[in-house]
C-alpha cells in the first residue's frame, strides 16, 4: 500500500505540492483569525460546585471569580472604629464593573473579617462574570482607589489570587510565534548536525511549517463545530513542530540511507515509504490514541484539547507521507548537496561503527547489569511521583511581589486564616429568609475547618441568598479537602433537611435548597471529574496501543514490554515535575517559582495524553528496524545490535528536537504551561536515554526468541502471520 502511495505521489508530485501550498496559505490566514474563537473558560457541567457557582452567577452576577482582598491595618488602634474605611472599600469596589459583591465587617459585623487584636481588617471584593484566560479584574484601578481614599494612618494593601497573579507579571510571556521560532531555531541546529546539507535540513522544517499551519486551518474549522481551548494554540505550534520534524526526520534519514546503498530516487522513495512510512503511521496512531482518550473525560476543556491536539499527529503523518515524498522526488541525490557542516561532524558510519554500534555490543554483553542499572535509575527518578498532588497551589505558596505580597504578609502577621483568599460560598434558594440564612451560617461556622461564616444582608435577592465562609486553611490545601467534604456531604444536607422540616410545619411547600460553591470546591470537583475517569482512560489507551503494536510487530511480548516501559517513562516525567515544581528543586532558580506543594490539576492528565504516544514513537522507530533486521536474519542478537546502531542517532536527534520545542513552550506565560512543557521535555529525554538506550535493548537481549512469540490463534485474531517463539 505504501509503495503504491509513493508511486502515486511521485506521479502527481506537483499537484500534491500545490495542494499543500494552498492549505498552508489558508492556514496562515486561519491562524490570524483564531484569536477571536478560542474557548477561554473551564467548565465542569453537572458537578455540584460548578452548578452552584453558575446559579450564583445567574442570580447575583458574581460567583465564578475569586475575590480581591483589601487589607487594612491600623497599628495600636481598633480598625473597626476608624472612620473612612468603609468609604474606601466602596471606592475600591466602584472600580469594578457592576454587579460587584462586597463582604466586610461593616455589612455583617462578623468577627471573621477582623484579626483577634482588631488591628487588621479584610474586605472581599468579588468581580462579576465568568473567569476566562483573558479575564483580568481591574487590580490596578481598585488598588489606586483604595490608596487614594483610605484615611491617614491606615495602611492598605490589595491581595488575593488575581492580584498575586498580576504581581507575577504572567501576561508578559512571549507570543506563540516567538516560542515557535525558539523551538525552530533549536531544531535547525540539531538537523544541521544530523544531516549537514541544506536540502536535507530544509525538508523536515518545511514539513513542520506546513503541518502546523494546516493544523491551525483544521482547528479553525473545528471551532465552528465545538469549543476549542486556547491552550491548543501552544500545543499546535510547539508539539506540532516537534512531531512533524520527528516524522519527517525518520523518512529523510531512511531516504538518504537507501540512496547511499546505490538505489535510484524512485526505488529509494519506495523503500523509505515501505519501512519508515510504516513507522510514521504507527507512531502517529499511538499519539492520536493518547489524545483520543481525552474524550472520555467529562470536561469540555479537556475534550477540546484532545480533539484539537489529535489533529497534530494526523496532519503531520499526512504531510510526511505525501508532501515529503513529493519534495524528495524532486531533489533526489541533490539532497546531499550544499553542505553547511563539515563532513567530519556528519560522516556516516556502518552499523557496527560509531558510538551506538559500540554501545549496542556493551549492552548485549552485560544485559543483566544494564537492566539492573536502568531499573535503579527508574526507581530514583520515578519515586517522587508517588506523592504527586494534583491541585491548584495554595496562595501562600505562590510567588508574590509588591503590594500583593505585602498584603499577604499582613494577613499572615495578623494571624488571619489562609482560607479567606478563596472563601466558601453557600447558596440558599427557595426561601432564603434572614432566619434560614442565619441558621445555615451558624451550622457552617461550627464545622471543623471553618474559621467563620456570615450572611451579609446585602447578599440577598428575592428568594435566594449567599453565605460567605472563611476556611482555616487555603481551599486548595490537603486539609481543606476534608472541610469541603464535610460541608458538601454532611453539614449542608443536614441543615437543608432541618430547614425544610421547619418550613413544612409552617405550611411552606417549597423546599429550601442549600449548595456549596466557591472556587475551592469547584477546583475539587474538577480533580474528581478528571481523575475519577482516569482508570478508564488508561485502560482504553493501553488496550488500543497494545493491539496496534501487536499487529505492527507480530508479537505478544514486544507490545507488552513497550506499553509497560512507556508507563515507566510517564511515571518518570511525573517524578521530575513533582521534584522540580511541587517540591521546588530548581524551579525558583530557573523560573522564580517556589515550591508549590502541588502540580496544577490538569497537567498530569495532559502529560499522559501527549507523552504516552510521543514517547512510543521512539519505541516504534527502534522496533520497526529491529523487526526488519530479524526478518532478514532470524538472529535476535544481530537484530537488536543493528537496530539500536541504526536508530540510536535518529532517536537521539528526534528527542532533542522535541526537547527544544518543549523548552521553548516552557517560556510561555503561567506556571501551568511551564509544568506541562517541562514534564513533556523531561519525559522525552528520559525515554530516549534510559528507556531506549538501556532498558529496551537489555530487555530484548534477555528475552531472546520470546520477543517474537505470536501463537497462531492470536495471529488469526490480529489477522497477521504467526511468529515463532
Residue ranges of model-derived segments:
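Short hinge/gating elements
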Residues: 37-40, 393-395
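Membrane-embedded transmembrane helical bundles of large multi-pass transporters/channels
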Residues: 1-36, 128-390, 511, 519-725
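Short beta-strand segments
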Residues: 71, 124, 253
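A detector of helix-start/N-cap boundary segments at the beginnings of structured domains
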Residues: 40-41, 79
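Disorder-to-helix initiation segments
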Residues: 41-42, 49, 238
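N-terminal cofactor/phosphate-binding cores enriched in small/glycine residues
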Residues: 22, 30-34, 45, 53, ...
Amino acid at each position: 500500500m505504501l509503495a503504491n502511495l509513493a508511486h502515486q505521489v511521485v506521479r502527481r508530485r506537483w499537484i500534491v505540492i500545490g495542494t499543500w501550498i494552498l492549505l498552508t496559505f489558508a492556514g496562515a490566514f486561519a491562524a490570524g483569525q483564531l484569536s477571536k474563537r478560542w474557548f477561554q473558560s473551564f467548565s465542569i457541567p453537572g458537578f455540584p460546585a460548578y452548578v452552584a457557582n453558575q446559579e450564583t452567577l445567574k442570580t447575583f452576577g458574581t460567583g465564578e471569580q475569586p475575590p480581591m482582598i483589601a487589607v487594612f491595618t491600623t497599628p495600636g488602634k481598633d480598625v473597626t472604629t476608624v472612620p473612612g474605611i468603609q468609604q474606601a472599600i466602596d471606592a475600591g469596589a466602584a472600580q469594578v464593573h457592576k454587579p460587584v459583591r462586597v463582604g466586610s465587617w461593616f455589612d455583617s459585623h462578623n468577627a471573621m473579617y477582623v484579626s483577634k487584636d482588631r488591628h487588621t481588617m479584610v474586605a472581599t471584593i468579588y468581580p462579576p462574570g465568568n473567569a476566562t484566560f483573558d479575564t483580568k479584574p481591574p487590580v490596578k484601578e481598585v488598588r489606586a482607589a483604595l490608596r487614594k481614599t483610605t484615611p491617614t494612618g491606615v495602611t492598605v494593601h490589595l491581595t488575593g489570587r488575581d492580584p498575586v497573579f498580576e504581581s507575577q507579571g504572567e501576561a508578559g510571556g512571549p507570543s506563540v510565534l516567538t516560542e515557535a521560532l525558539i523551538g525552530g531555531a533549536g531544531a535547525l541546529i540539531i538537523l544541521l548536525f544530523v544531516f549537514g546539507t541544506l536540502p536535507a535540513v530544509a525538508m523536515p522544517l518545511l514539513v513542520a511549517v506546513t503541518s502546523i499551519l494546516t493544523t491551525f486551518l483544521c482547528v479553525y474549522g473545528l471551532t465552528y463545530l465545538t469549543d476549542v481551548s486556547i491552550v491548543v494554540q501552544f500545543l499546535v505550534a510547539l508539539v506540532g513542530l516537534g512531531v512533524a520534524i520527528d516524522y519527517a526526520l525518520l523518512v529523510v534519514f531512511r531516504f538518504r540511507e537507501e540512496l547511499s546503498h546505490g538505489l535510484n530516487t524512485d526505488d529509494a522513495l519506495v523503500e523509505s515509504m515501505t519501512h519508515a512510512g510504516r513507522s510514521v503511521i504507527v507512531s502517529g496512531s499511538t499519539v492520536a490514541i493518547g489524545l483520543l482518550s481525552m474524550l472520555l473525560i467529562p470536561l469540555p476543556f479537556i475534550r477540546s484539547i484532545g480533539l484539537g491536539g489529535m489533529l497534530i499527529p494526523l496532519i503531520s503523518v499526512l504531510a510526511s507521507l505525501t508532501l515529503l515524498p513529493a519534495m524528495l522526488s524532486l531533489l533526489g541525490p541533490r539532497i546531499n548537496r550544499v553542505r553547511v557542516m563539515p563532513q567530519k561532524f556528519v560522516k556516516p558510519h556502518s552499523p557496527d561503527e560509531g558510538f551506538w554500534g559500540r554501545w549496542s555490543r556493551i549492552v548485549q554483553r552485560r544485559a543483566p547489569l544494564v537492566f539492573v542499572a536502568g531499573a535503579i535509575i527508574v526507581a530514583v527518578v520515578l519515586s517522587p511521583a508517588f506523592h504527586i498532588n494534583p491541585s491548584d497551589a495554595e496562595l501562600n505558596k505562590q510567588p508574590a511581589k509588591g503590594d500583593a505580597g505585602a498584603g499577604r504578609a499582613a494577613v499572615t502577621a495578623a494571624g488571619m486564616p489562609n482560607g479567606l483568599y478563596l472563601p466558601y460560598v453557600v447558596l440558599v434558594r427557595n426561601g432564603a429568609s434572614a432566619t434560614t440564612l442565619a441558621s445555615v451560617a451558624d451550622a457552617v461556622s461550627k464545622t471543623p475547618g471553618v474559621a467563620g461564616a456570615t450572611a451579609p444582608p446585602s447578599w440577598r435577592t428575592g428568594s435566594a441568598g449567599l453565605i460567605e465562609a472563611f476556611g482555616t486553611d487555603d481551599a486548595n490545601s490537603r486539609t481543606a479537602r476534608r472541610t469541603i467534604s464535610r460541608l458538601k456531604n454532611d453539614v449542608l444536607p443536614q441543615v437543608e433537611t432541618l430547614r425544610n422540616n421547619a418550613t413544612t410545619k409552617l405550611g411552606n411547600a417549597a423546599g429550601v435548597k442549600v449548595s456549596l460553591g466557591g472556587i475551592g470546591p469547584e477546583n475539587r470537583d474538577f480533580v474528581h471529574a478528571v481523575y475519577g475517569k482516569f482508570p478508564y482512560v488508561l485502560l482504553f489507551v493501553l488496550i488500543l496501543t497494545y493491539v496496534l503494536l501487536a499487529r505492527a510487530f507480530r508479537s505478544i511480548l514486544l507490545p507488552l514490554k513497550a506499553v509497560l516501559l512507556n508507563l515507566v517513562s510517564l511515571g518518570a516525567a511525573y517524578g521530575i515535575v513533582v521534584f522540580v515544581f511541587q517540591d521546588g528543586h530548581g524551579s525558583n532558580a530557573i523560573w522564580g517559582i517556589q515550591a508549590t506543594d502541588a502540580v496544577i490539576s490538569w497537567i498530569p492528565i495532559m502529560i499522559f495524553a501527549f507523552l504516552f504516544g510521543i514517547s512510543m514513537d521512539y519505541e516504534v522507530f527502534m522496533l520497526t528496524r529491529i523487526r526488519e533486521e530479524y526478518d532478514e536474519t532470524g538472529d535476535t542478537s544481530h537484530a537488536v545490535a543493528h537496530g539500536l546502531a541504526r536508530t540510536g542517532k535518529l532517536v537521539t536527534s528526534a528527542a532533542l528536537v522535541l526537547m527544544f520545542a518543549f523548552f521553548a513552550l516552557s517560556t510561555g506565560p503561567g506556571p501551568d504551561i511551564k509544568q506541562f512543557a517541562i514534564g513533556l521535555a523531561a519525559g522525552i529525554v528520559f525515554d530516549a536515554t534510559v528507556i531506549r538506550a538501556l532498558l529496551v535493548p537489555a530487555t530484548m537481549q534477555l528475552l531472546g526468541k520470546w520477543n517474537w512469540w505470536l501463537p497462531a490463534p492470536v495471529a488469526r485474531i490480529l489477522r497477521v502471520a504467526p511468529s515463532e517463539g
